Regions:
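Juxta-kinase regulatory segment immediately upstream of eukaryotic protein kinase catalytic domains
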Residues: 53-62
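Conserved ATP-binding/catalytic core of the eukaryotic-like protein kinase fold
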Residues: 4, 12, 45, 61-102
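N-terminal anchoring/assembly modules that precede and organize ATP-driven motor systems
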Residues: 1-50
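Proline- and acidic/polar-enriched loop/turn elements at helix boundaries
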Residues: 24-25, 56-57, 89
C-alpha cells in the first residue's frame, strides 16, 4: 500500500510522533524538500526526528499502534514467548521506559 506525502504527514501528526508544524519546518530546511512519503520518512529517520519503527508503522497505516495509554512507542527492544518489549516515552513527563506487551 502506497500512501501520499499528505497522508503520511497527517498520520505522523495524528499518532503524536511529530507535529505537522514541525514537519513543515523540517521540510523548509531541506533542499530539496521530500516529494514522497518514503523520502520524507527516510529523511526524518536520518535526522533522528522519528525512529525507523515509527516511520515504518505510519507508512503502513498503523500509526495508531504507536500510542499505548500515555506512552509513545519509540522502538522495539525485543520479543519473546510472552510478548514484545518496547522503548517508550511518557508523553507528559518525557520519561523513557521499557514497556512489555503480552
Amino acid at each position: 500500500m502506497t500512501i501520499t506525502l499528505e497522508q503520511f504527514i497527517s498520520q505522523l501528526d495524528e499518532s503524536g510522533v511529530i507535529s505537522a508544524v514541525d514537519i513543515a519546518a523540517f521540510q523548509e530546511s531541506q533542499s530539496p524538500p521530500a516529494e514522497s512519503a518514503e523520502d520524507l520518512g527516510k529523511l526524518l529517520v536520518k535526522q533522528k526526528k522519528v525512529t525507523k519503527l515509527q516511520a515504518q508503522l505510519v507508512y503502513q497505516g498503523k500509526g495508531n499502534r504507536l500510542l499505548l495509554g500515555n506512552y509513545l512507542i519509540l522502538d522495539k527492544i525485543g520479543a519473546g514467548g510472552m510478548g514484545d518489549v518496547y522503548l517508550a516515552e511518557h508523553r507528559r513527563m518525557e520519561r523513557r521506559v521499557a514497556l512489555k506487551t503480552l
